[in-house]
């Protein structure tokens, strides 16, 4: 049943992706720079990022935004729009996240040390079951498949739960990422 639930949520997520080019310019017009470290953020409803302010994380603002280090004026507005396009519908992923529970039992298949940044290819599939009912309450598939020295296909489906942040933050956001052009290695 959890797989059907994810498929329905995934379909809704894909439909919401179509609204990002329309919503991002409007939402960016009504947001301003906010301080870092004020987690959780609540701007932008389903289009906003719960873990970073409207201008984006510090690395994005400093290096990857269209106008590096600019957070105000027209250029800051463009950076906020680009941030929402780069991180689409994070609020939706948070709203339909899997809540952490100490009574979960983890079942892991595959290699749990994979990483696109550390050049460690492979895959894993994780299921979480409720200890008392033994019902599957969540899953995650993560795969890193390099095809050149600097590029890989990165796939993450389910809920992003096989990380330290699941217990720390108390939730695992919904994910449905298939990136055929991901950078392989720390770039």
What are these regions (language model features)?
Residues 41, 48, 52, 63, ...:
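Intrinsically disordered, low-complexity, compositionally biased regions/tails
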Residues 2-39:
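A transmembrane-helix-recognition feature enriched in membrane-embedded lipid enzymes
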Residues 138-187:
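Charge-dense, extended regions
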Residues 35, 42, 46, 57, ...:
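Intrinsically disordered, low-complexity segments enriched in small/polar residues
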Residues 72, 82-159:
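Acidic, low-complexity, intrinsically disordered interaction modules
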Residues 24-105:
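N-terminal topogenic membrane-targeting module
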